[in-house]
UniProtKB/Swiss-Prot annotation:
Alphabetized GO MF terms: ATP binding; MAP kinase activity; protein serine kinase activity
Comment block on domains: The TXY motif contains the threonine and tyrosine residues whose phosphorylation activates the MAP kinases.
Family: Belongs to the protein kinase superfamily. CMGC Ser/Thr protein kinase family. MAP kinase subfamily.
Pfam families in alphabetical order: Pkinase (PF00069)
Gene from which the chain derives: MPK19
Name of the protein in question: Mitogen-activated protein kinase 19
The protein's Enzyme Commission number: 2.7.11.24
Short motif TXY, span: 187-189
Alphabetical UniProt keywords: ATP-binding, Kinase, Nucleotide-binding, Phosphoprotein, Serine/threonine-protein kinase, Transferase
The organism of origin for this protein: Arabidopsis thaliana (Mouse-ear cress)
Length: 598
């Protein structure tokens, strides 16, 4: 036992090595491993928040990998939005000129959209609508900043138990500047083929547009509807075959604009194919959703809507107002001046160190005044050894230490620009976020109430619609109303977003995570089976799942993730759009997730 504990302590000490900021975080567990390094769940002892800390090993071993990491940390600092994953901090290295590893502190997310789709065949129309709404909202913000993600796929969209989605992994993203060749042709495009726009399959167009991300979102949404990838091509030719099998052969003027001669010849010689009606391909989907999906998947990029136009589609009529969705100022060309130069490893090290200092304002000021003198900080190994020894003695029951104030604050954009909010406007429903749920029920058998911070006993869970044997899922999370719209102007530092949707109404769906124990799961399953069936039965999606290809190194194998689609307010009260605003889900047995920068 003692040797095991010593081995554990040694691993934890090796995780942080000599990084001074390590004193601030208490490691909980390793949640992901890969060729890049390790991801750990931890507690921020200054705030009490749970975070994910990604250690990226040997950042400067390859210049291309170092550039990708630099690009991503810079973009995530500049793009602050509730639907984009947030870097909370980057730990300060012990030396400016000698550090090899970096530690990036993210907000902790329980799963990703790939796992949600893979493990659930009972997602409702309300889930479909809310998922697409969040993805398009993130795209609108990115595209107004002239940023193209270029690698959107379910594994790069993180998910929480309350159905909150956040886009991550900006390593392949690019900023478009009108006077640079990067907006004309990108030769380094290596994104996942299944979600790649047709104009990228053969390098069709002479100039790429934000429509490449719109296509990817369409493919992801189709996968949400059916539970399996829409175009799982095995090669570029096979990919084009699958696309044309559904959409039909493109128009002659579209083919004429194809850049790649072989691809152009292949499409011209292809037999005539007709468009397959989307109602036939997706028989259980909302007709309004299919009409929007068909626009997102237009073969010609000029025929696809922008993210803002898609948000204005009748499919989202009562979910939010497009004019209130936040936009971002275009990113300055100077931020990505390094993309135009040939950089050495030392150059990139200097630039990454400069990005790290953005999360340490006082040190950044000192650094700028001293023209780049290095900073050395004492090792945190002794402090961590005491923490883990204390946890072992107390069986891990110690609570986080929460000082009243944070010592450092990051330096993102000071504000996100959005239209003014009328103080006399109708009270709004929080359509994108809800209060976080507790990871497990308290020892006294109560869960926090999201409406008034009161507690209530846990009752037997309701029967899960379309439940499977041995599968236990609880109910869902609350959406909180905000009665003071004067405070509802968008703030980039918060993850709440308010939209004018419904009259003020508090909903208490009582969501909590079940502890991952077999005995409790069996007991809950017995109780759930004894309850009467709810009136609302979600639409069943295709349960067929494809083989999992190209597994994400950040995501470990896991049990199924469960989602309960039960709505607590009948659709007759608010109508389908109102029901969409309160559709949420609860996950169990959550595995590790990725945060980009592979």
């Amino acid at each position: 036992m003692q040797k095991t504990q010593e081995k554990k302590n040694m691993k934890e000490m090796e995780f942080f090595t000599e990084y001074g900021d390590a004193n601030r975080y208490r490691i909980l567990e390793v949640i992901g491993k890969g060729s890049y390094g390790v991801v750990c769940a931890a507690i921020d002892t200054q705030t009490g928040e749970k975070v994910a800390i990604k250690k990226i090993n040997d950042v400067f071993e390859h210049v291309s990998d170092a550039l990708r990491i630099l690009r991503e940390v810079k973009l995530l600092r500049l793009l602050r939005h509730p639907d984009i994953v947030e870097i909370k901090s980057i730990m300060l290295p012990p030396s400016k000129r000698e550090f090899k590893d970096i530690y990036v502190v993210f907000e902790l997310m329980e799963s990703d959209l790939h796992q949600v789709i893979k493990a659930n065949d009972d997602l409702t129309r309300e889930h479909h609508q809310f998922f697409l709404y969040q993805m398009l909202r993130a795209l609108k913000y990115m595209h107004t900043a002239n940023v193209y993600h270029r690698d959107l796929k379910p594994k790069n969209i993180l998910a929480n138990a309350n159905c909150k989605l956040k886009v991550c992994d900006f390593g392949l993203a690019r900023v478009s500047f009108n006077d640079t060749p990067t907006t004309v042709f990108w030769t380094d495009y290596v994104a996942t083929r299944w979600y790649r726009a047709p104009e990228l399959c053969g390098s069709f167009c002479s100039k790429y547009t934000p429509a490449i991300d719109i296509w990817s979102i369409g493919c992801i949404f189709a996968e949400v509807l059916t539970g399996k990838p829409l175009f799982p091509g095995k090669s570029v030719v096979h990919q084009l075959d699958l696309i044309t099998d559904l959409l039909g052969t493109p128009k002659s003027e579209t083919i004429a604009g194809v850049r790649n001669e072989k691809a152009r010849k292949y499409l011209n010689e292809m037999r005539k194919k007709n468009l397959v009606p989307f109602s036939q391909k997706f028989p259980n989907a909302d007709p309004l959703a299919l009409r929007l999906l068909q626009r997102l998947l237009a073969f010609d990029p000029k025929d696809r809507p922008t993210a803002a136009e898609a948000l204005a589609d009748p499919y989202f009529k009562c979910l939010a107002k497009v004019e209130r969705e936040p936009s971002c100022q275009p990113i300055s060309k100077m931020e990505f001046e390094f993309e135009r130069r040939r950089l050495t490893k030392d150059d990139i090290r200097e630039l990454i160190y400069r990005e790290i200092l953005e999360y340490h304002p006082q040190l950044l000021k000192d650094y700028m005044n001293s023209e780049g003198s290095s900073f050395l900080y004492p090792s945190a190994i002794g402090h961590l050894r005491k923490q883990f020894a204390y946890l072992e003695e107390n069986s891990g029951k110690s609570g986080p230490v929460i000082p009243p104030d944070r010592k450092h604050a990051s330096l993102p954009r000071s504000a996100v620009h959005s239209s003014a909010v009328n103080s006399n406007a109708q009270p709004s429903l929080n359509a994108s976020d809800s209060r976080r749920v507790s990871i497990e029920p308290s020892r006294n058998g109560v869960v926090p109430s999201t409406s008034a911070y009161s507690t209530k006993p846990l009752g037997p869970p309701p029967r899960v619609p379309s439940g499977k044997p041995g599968r236990v899922v609880e109910s869902s999370v609350t959406y909180e109303n905000d009665r003071n719209l004067k405070e509802s102007s968008y703030d980039a530092r918060t993850s709440y977003y308010r939209s004018t949707v419904l009259p003020p109404q508090t909903v208490s769906p009582n969501c909590y995570f079940l502890p991952n124990t077999m005995n409790q799961e069996k007991r809950s399953g017995t109780e759930a089976a004894s309850q009467p069936k709810p009136q609302f039965v979600p639409t069943q999606c295709n349960s067929a799942k494809p083989a999992e290809l190209n597994p994400n190194p950040y995501v470990q194998s896991q049990h199924k993730v469960g989602i309960d689609a039960k709505l607590l307010h009948a659709q007759s009260q608010y109508g389908p759009a109102g029901a969409a605003a309160v559709a949420v889900a609860a996950h169990r047995n959550i595995g590790a997730v990725g945060y980009g920068m592979s």
